[in-house]
Amino acid sequence: MAVKEITPQEAHDILTSDASTVYIDVRTEREFANGHPQGAVNIPVAFPDPARGMVMNPDFVKVVETNFAPDKKIIVGCQAGPRSNAAAGLLQQAGYQDVANMVGGFGGMRDPSGNVVAPGWAASGLPVSQDNGEGVSYQSMVAKAR
């Protein structure tokens, strides 16, 4: 099944009109702490590894399953779109039916020349938060899965 794609503005509109929808920011903990869509929770789909670049988070689906039921409406986003597209696919494989990937992510998607091809959440002027505490941080999400 193809992953549904939405723009940052569409994501914001859904989150504003449907409080039961959750936004999962799949970027690293550091990226999340530097700013994220208001109301987002952080569950990284991959972690940085100095020797290998990015490595998949083996607990990604488990942490999502612990925190959110399979019938939950979920929007996933990353920095530009590719990581969240992969995360959305993993969630669909795990049985989540209502998952959308936010194209452009938080920072915007660029072509090889550096031109913005899909503006991100921040550039769209949407609400940004730096809250990284209980209930939104990866550490608080993963603690429930232990």
Residue positions per predicted region:
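Rhodanese-like catalytic fold shared by cysteine-dependent sulfurtransferases
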Residues: 1-22, 29-73, 84-146
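Short, surface-exposed ligand- or partner-binding patches at beta-edge/loop junctions that are enriched
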Residues: 76-77
